[in-house]
Amino acid sequence: MTFNEILATLPTIEHLNEIKILENGKQIHQIPAAPGKLGSLRVYNALAEEFNGKLDRTSAQKGLQLFAEHTEDARQFPSKHPNIDLLLRVIEQDLCYHIEAH
């Protein structure tokens, strides 16, 4: 499935203003509900719902699957997709964060 096909299967995000990624209660990353960010917002919201707000190696791997073809693009062009870069970093460094949807 393509990214757009996958997005259509994920929970809606009309009620959200942003997603915050927290480390020990401190915000380290943010995804606003803004044009160009809504796909990422939807993916991270789906991860938050499925994994009870936990962003770790397992949920990050699922996130990479959801980002579909954009994942390979992010690997080839670091910094082009910061929300995917975060997932890659979580996996590579075995990090654990909290996803908070607002």
Stretch-by-stretch model annotation:
Residues F3-G25:
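Short, charge-rich, low-complexity alpha-helical interaction segments
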Residues Q61-H102:
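Short, compact, well-ordered microdomains
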Residues I13-H15, L41, A46-L47, L87:
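Intrinsically disordered, charged low-complexity linkers and terminal tails
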Residues N4-I6, I21, Q30-I31, P35, ...:
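A structural boundary/capping signal
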Residues K20-T58:
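Amphipathic alpha-helical interaction modules
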